[in-house]
Amino acid sequence: MALGETITQNVFGGLSNDFKKKNFSLYGQWISIFTIFLCIALGIANIFHFNLVIIFSVICIVQGLIVIFVEVPFLLRICPLTDTFTNFIRKFDGNLPRCGFYLLNAVIQWLSCTLQATSLIVVAIFFTLASACYALAYAKNQEYLKSSIDVTGTGQGGALEAQVGEHVVRNVL
């Protein structure tokens, strides 16, 4: 029980610290992490339509999986991925590239409304909000920051990327 409390305290403490910094890139990151869950859940929920919305629901699921790697970069180290994909994901390491990435994802999901109004509009709204946060961070010349959540309790904090210990080796065979 104590371990669960420690993890919860570290997560919510990091979340609280992130919002105190008033940096729009952190807001964009948190909106994007929430959007991952929306993409997967609503993509699966809308896959049962019997029209072309199925295409957009599959695209939504794929978008959610790609956003996981964009927002949680330590997964690039532990998952066996091609160097091409890894280099593609690393191109979005800044406010302006992420703004464009999320804007493109939003446009794709807004296009799903031309076929039928479904719950995919929620995904489009959240992609638009994430893009707007990164655009505001760029416009205000705010530094691109990563979350300071410390799930491990090591006190190192600083970026979801830093949470993988050095003992993890990317083994692609």
From Swiss-Prot:
The chain crosses the membrane at residues 28-48, 50-70, 96-112, 119-139. It comes from the Eukaryota. It is found in: Golgi apparatus membrane. The keyword Transmembrane helix applies. Disulfide bonds: none annotated. The keyword Membrane applies. Its main location: Golgi. Glycans are attached at residue 23. Keywords: Glycoprotein, Golgi apparatus, Membrane, Transmembrane, Transmembrane helix. GO terms for cellular component: Golgi membrane. It is a multi-pass membrane protein. GO terms for biological process: vesicle-mediated transport. Belongs to the TVP18 family. Golgi membrane protein involved in vesicular trafficking. This is Golgi apparatus membrane protein TVP18. It comes from Lodderomyces elongisporus (strain ATCC 11503 / CBS 2605 / JCM 1781 / NBRC 1676 / NRRL YB-4239).
